[in-house]
Amino acid sequence: MENYNVKTRAFPTIGIILLGGISDKKNRIPLHTTAGIAYTGINNDVYTETKLYVSKDEKCYIDGKEIDLNSDRSPSKVIDKFKHEILMRVNLDDENNLSIDSRNFNILSGSSDSGAAALGECIESIFEYNINIFTFENDLQRISESVGRSLYGGLTVNYANGRESLTEPLLEPEAFNNFTIIGAHFNIDRKPSNEIHENIIKHENYRERIKSAERKAKKLEELSRNANIKGIFELAESDTVEYHKMLHDVGVDIINDRMENLIERVKEMKNNFWNSYIVTGGPNVFVITEKKDVDKAMEGLNDLCDDIRLLKVAGKPQVISKNF
């Protein structure tokens, strides 16, 4: 039965307008508009690879570890919705099941998005893309609230208000060809995303955060129309500052002393060449430079983090093989 399978590859993500606050733990619709990019390594070696296959018993493996099918954000919540129709396409009855095996490669942050998008691409390809992508995105958000960033690739904006959510592409990856993202990683535990979502909404200025995100999204659309890549990443840096100040105010600190030291070095380097930085919810500082300045930036950052990767903006998911 495992002969019926599809394998896909999708790319993790980095926030540009950062997400904080979701409707509930089941549906995970963002409470405000956000934006982000998909990324991979400069040698295309950063991705999630997922196989969806027909099996006797339903199983879900992530990086070789079997996960509880009833756990929060379990892929089975999405698979079960489409199981009957998928099995019908290969003339199998509901006594059969669908399982997934998903593996992450060299990902610093954003693997939930790429995992959800890779599963989504598996399902879409079986239906030959004859599926309502807007409602389907909402299904996949039950796994990862910002999955749209990986579903479309490039730069995207997600318009949301806690009840409805819609992602639209703004720029293709090629628009970023003259820029490199340096991923500076620190070997510390990351905060669970739910800790961020549950606490940031307690901030006294959270309503203003919602308005600020809307204003930034409009600005991002304008910057994208003009292909102003520096402006896009400068907006991202300003949003990082606002976001992490709010998190600090409610007792959730993502940026530790070592990360702060690296950020200070990034600011110093601005005197010599253009750069910008982003910190999302994990133990990473993403530093963006023009390609011509990468060596200078690397020289200044190498001794301040535990690992460093060269990254680039990535595209949408890909089907690697299919037998359905």
Swiss-Prot record:
Subunit structure: Homodimer.
UniProt source species: Picrophilus torridus (strain ATCC 700027 / DSM 9790 / JCM 10055 / NBRC 100828 / KAW 2/3)
The keyword Nucleotide-binding is assigned to this record: yes
A Pfam family hit: MVD-like_N
UniProt: ATP binding residues: 109-112, 190, 193
Family assignment from sequence similarity: Belongs to the GHMP kinase family.
Protein name, UniProt field: Mevalonate-3-kinase
Enzyme Commission designation: 2.7.1.185
Disulfide-bonded cysteines: none
Keywords: ATP-binding, Isoprene biosynthesis, Kinase, Nucleotide-binding, Transferase
Kinase found in the keyword field: yes
Entry's transmembrane regions: none
A GO molecular-function annotation: kinase activity
Pathway in which this enzyme or protein is active: Isoprenoid biosynthesis; isopentenyl diphosphate biosynthesis via mevalonate pathway
Example GO biological process: isopentenyl diphosphate biosynthetic process, mevalonate pathway
Catalyzed chemical reaction(s): (R)-mevalonate + ATP = (R)-3-phosphomevalonate + ADP + H(+)
Entry function: Catalyzes the phosphorylation of mevalonate (MVA) to yield mevalonate-3-phosphate. Functions in an alternative mevalonate pathway, which passes through mevalonate 3-phosphate rather than mevalonate 5-phosphate. Also able to catalyze the formation of isobutene via the conversion of 3-hydroxyisovalerate (3-HIV) to an unstable 3-phosphate intermediate that undergoes a spontaneous decarboxylation.
Residues annotated as binding substrate: 19, 145, 149
